[in-house]
Amino acid sequence: MFMFWFAFGFGFAFGFAFGFAFGFAFGFGFAFAAIKFKQLALANEKELSVCVLEKGAEVGAHILSGNVFEPRAFDELFPDVDKSEVLDGEGNSVFNTPVEEDKFLFLTSEEKAAPAIPNALLPSQLHNEGNYVISLGQLCRWMGAQAEELGVEIYAGFAASEVLYDESNAVKGIATRDVGIGKDGKPKDTFERGIELHARQTVFCEGARGSCSEELIKKFGLREANSAQPQTYGLGVKEVWEVDLEKNENFRPGFVQHTIGWPLQDHPLSKTFGGSFLYHQAPNRVLLGFVVGLDYENPYLSPYKEFQRWKHHPEVSKYLEGGACVSYGARVLNEGGLHSIPKLTFPGGILAGCSAGFLNSVKIKGSHTAIKSGIVAAEAIYEELSKDEESFVGVNFEINAEDKPKEIVSYQENMETSWVYEELKAVRNCHAAFHYGFLPGMMYAGVAAHVLRGNEPWTLSNASEDSDKTKPASAFQEINYPKPDGVFSFDLLTNLQRSGTYHTDDQPAHLRIKPECGSKAWKDSIATYDGPEQNFCPAGVYEYVIDDGETEKRLQINAQNCVHCKCCSIKMPHQYINWTVPEGGGGPQYQLM
């Protein structure tokens, strides 16, 4: 049993004796694990309580993805669901746009493109027959409703800020952040104490580079335990446009286009990894975005500005004519693949979804693998808890104090024999091949897809962190990006408004310079790398300013702009920023992402 505390601003505190069989730090895989667990419990007439925390203001508010959705795992969980009845908030089917046309282009310059690469020459994993163009956030909202119907408790606007451990160092749950604390660290009139949630098992589905997940990976040595390479990431920047069908005859629902080449790869041995996507979703939306591997070398490169100039290419702009940008956002994604997956279990909890790193970077998809990992997690946890009838939560939903948190080792075993690992094994060396250059990487990916098929007896390694790949500014010239025209391209602060980002101003900063780094780290960043944080952040959080009467620049952190992409915790020189959760409900308010 534990005490679940609410502290209210008017000074009263109430304690409740609630325990949970199963708890989550929220991410895309959350709902599928929660639903599967409740399905198993109800089928066996067990009363088990499941709790989910969502740091966004509502379910789906912090979800951002391409998204061409592969329904394989969704169909496993809902074999009898008619997809036309999976509805968004406006009563439209989330799955109303099946992929009808697949196109892959190599852009040779800002004006030209080579002929489309024939599908027969592309890896089968890039084919999208049977997939759907969707809003992943809308699907999450539907999934949240399904979970609540089954009795899952979802607390939106609560940010998991701390992992809780028992006397044996096993995870016993999480704590949420106190709210109503001012910048000065003192409680305001709106102060509410954070709450502790204790659970028999806690599943961490925080998405790529989750703060609690990263703590657990380090604390339990999960990378070392699995001989995993350092994770490598990409930054995805996305917009949603709505076009006037009377003014744009190029719109075709179900049209899918990916590009490589210009503007990132300007010569055959370019080591900058990345490309673009552009999807047409009924009735009139164009979903488009740009992904840049964060292992790039040039500190002057700006993923956001590369995205903006890419939109001016004729093979892109023709789909935006007569339209308007209605939403903007950004998020990092895992690109390390199979080699970078840590050990998945530890006493009292597990990692699932992109917290573990199951994204397939060749497919440019991770939602289907996140769903599958959630299903496998629920099955493994339920099976373990079922071994001892007395270990189930009792009639008062109290946790048996004598029953210590378990490590669900079967989850690791079951994932390794699942189709997720089979899929990732087939492309395990493809991303690392691009470290030798763009053309060698493309050639290797082709051979791996059509000949080797994952059976190569060697491993191409990613030996270092993305932050270590940045080279000194002296090796490069500053990039002269074109000015945004306000039609196809936009300045960053204008676009940021389309993300709906909001944080309470009077709260402690959630982006903090690590004490062991101090000002020395950012001073070295500006002196050696010319301040790359000014360029890679897709929200204008970091800038170097000169105060009146001063001659030297200083770092200014505009934490209120943060879209929670996590890029700074990855690419910052010396990784000197500690990304922590702000007050729950803050951050972007994505509706269509």
Language-model-derived ranges and their functions:
Residues 357-363, 375, 379-437, 551, ...:
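Active-site-proximal substrate-binding core of FAD-dependent oxidoreductases
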Residues 330-361, 495-509, 518-536, 543:
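FAD-binding beta-loop-beta segment adjacent to the flavin cofactor pocket
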Residues 113-137, 145, 173, 291-293:
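Helix-loop-beta segment of a Rossmann-like dinucleotide-binding subdomain
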Residues 46-111:
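N-terminal FAD cofactor-binding segment of flavoenzymes
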Residues 434-486:
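C-terminal auxiliary extensions adjacent to catalytic cores
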Residues 528-560, 567-589:
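Iron-sulfur cluster-binding cysteine motifs and their immediate structural context
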Residues 1-9, 15, 19-51:
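N-terminal Rossmann-like FAD-binding beta1-loop-alpha1 element of flavoenzymes
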Residues 44, 137, 141-142, 146-318, ...:
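Predominantly flavin-linked oxidoreductase catalytic cores and closely associated redox partners
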